Amino acid sequence: MLNVFTLANGRLFQEEIDSLDELTPARPVWVDLEDPTPEEKGWIAVRFGLVIPADIIDDDLEESARFYEEEGAIHIRSDFLIDDDEAPRNVRVAFILHENVLFSVHREDLPVFRLLRMRARRIPALIEDAKDVLLKLYDADAEYSADTLEGIYDDLEKVSHRVLNSEVNDQAAAGALAAIARQEDLNGRIRRNVMDTRRAVSFMMRARMLNADQFEEARQILRDIDSLDSHTAFLFDKINFLMDATVGFININQNKIIKIFSVASVALLPPTLIASVYGMNFKTMPELDWQFGYPFAIAVMVASVITPFWYFRRKGWLN
């Protein structure tokens, strides 16, 4: 899918392009390619003289391959967060700033992009050129990360009440561990996301491509990211605490089970010993010829079971 965005009356307007003829007269500040076809890439090459490589959004964490200038164009690759309840993930986006037009290439639509499109349509003078689009995307990305962190706070608060304010059985503990693991994964993705945004914005500042107002906006984005770092660190500590508490409750429940088996084994040991003794069946055993030998042995075995249980209960070991 290929969308172009043009400025008119201080607002950003979107137009979906279905052919080269539709693209030719356009004068966009931003061209967004979502999972582009080779044909759409060919239109870009014809209209703007820009060749988009086939591997432009391949994963590569080397900084030299993610931020560079080539033939007058600035190339930036960044990760953007998608907070999906089923599968949160970081999506790679490749930006190319070429002749005052921003080109973005990605495989799926992103919440940050939708947020910017909505704001740019409603707020006049929000965007003046292609570099503003890129900065506003990073600003919206930091804001989206902050909103997602607030969601983690809320979810962990619910887990905390479930773990700390009630009797936790194994099933509840397993559910709590799964919820904690999901939040830990999401928090890690946010931390990776803001780290990547910091590197991209810092590169733009070092490249001397921003005017004074844009440079100040970039500094504000970095300050916002710095504040998010402390929140992600705190959430990691809280997640570790809840994880340890939940595992502790699981250990307590397991110890209760082991305690029951231990008490049962100790209580059943004396009658087993008595039964073993009388099972020897030696001729010299007087109880074999005694009329009440069998009920006597049964009574002794029952008493040997009751006595340990009575003693354990008195000591409070069965509570």
What are these regions (language model features)?
Residues 208-216, 287, 292:
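Membrane interface segments of multi-pass transport proteins and intramembrane proteases
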Residues 223-319:
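Hydrophobic alpha-helical transmembrane segments and their immediately adjacent juxtamembrane loops
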